[in-house]
Amino acid sequence: MEKSRIIIALDYPNEEQALSLVRQLDPAQCRLKVGKELFTRAGPSLVKRLAAQGFPIFLDLKFHDIPHTVARACLAAADLGVWMLNIHALGGLSMMKAAQEALANHPSHPQLIAVTVLTSMDQAALSQIGLAGTPEDNVLQLALLTQEAGLDGIVCSGQEAPALRQTLGKEFLLVTPGIRPAGAAPKDQQRVLTPREALAKGANYLVIGRPITAAPDPMMALRAIEAEISNV
């Protein structure tokens, strides 16, 4: 069975609630994302536990620091057995290269991707922090820098995926948050698409949180999304 393209964001405030969902899942059904809140509360032991159960883990901590510090943090993450981790492209070329080189010989070979422009930021928000151009302009510039650094891909909005796929080639991973099934409210992410739309535009993986984790029946929500994307 092909590994799932759905990454479930474990947006829970504690380990017990996260594990309550995980116990309903099979590693062949999905991948799991552990972010800042859950990692800070539950620690590396939870990541190790989930990885040991066979779940591909995306550790979403968005490292952004001087090159040496980020490189060491990436190695520490890889030692937890994660499938994927991320860093901030705004940390620059040297920082990204240091992270990539640190992981190059790690036995687990985790996927290293970069965050470009946060999906909560529209053009007005970018202007407020001094970045000229549209979100798409900034995403493309940072994506090219990420590829130059030798990373495996980026986190991006599905709306930018067609242009990125054309520019960066078919092997470059596009991991897309801001996914809401048809009819769901967009919440705090501005550049949103349905799962089907995002894959059709070139995304490789879909990060989906509240539409599954906050659903009355999370497994029913997951199955509905799987049905929606089954022929894309």
From Swiss-Prot:
Q: Which reaction does it catalyse?
A: orotidine 5'-phosphate + H(+) = UMP + CO2
Any GO BP annotation: 'de novo' UMP biosynthetic process
* GO molecular-function terms, A-Z: orotidine-5'-phosphate decarboxylase activity
Q: Which UniProt keywords are listed?
A: Decarboxylase, Lyase, Pyrimidine biosynthesis
Q: Does the keyword Zinc apply?
A: no
- E.C. numbers: 4.1.1.23
Query: Which InterPro entries does this entry report, sorted A to Z?
Result: Aldolase_TIM, OMPdecase, OMPdecase_AS, OMPdecase_bac, OMPdeCOase_dom, RibuloseP-bd_barrel
The answer, when asked if 4Fe-4S is one of the entry's keywords, is no
Residues holding substrate: 11, 33, 60-69, 119, 180, 189, 209-210
Pathway listed for it?
Answer: Pyrimidine metabolism; UMP biosynthesis via de novo pathway; UMP from orotate: step 2/2
- Which of the seven top EC classes does this enzyme belong to? lyase
- Similarity comment: Belongs to the OMP decarboxylase family. Type 1 subfamily.
Q: What is this protein called?
A: Orotidine 5'-phosphate decarboxylase
| Upper classification of the organism | Bacteria, Pseudomonadati, Pseudomonadota, Gammaproteobacteria, Chromatiales
Name of the encoding gene = pyrF
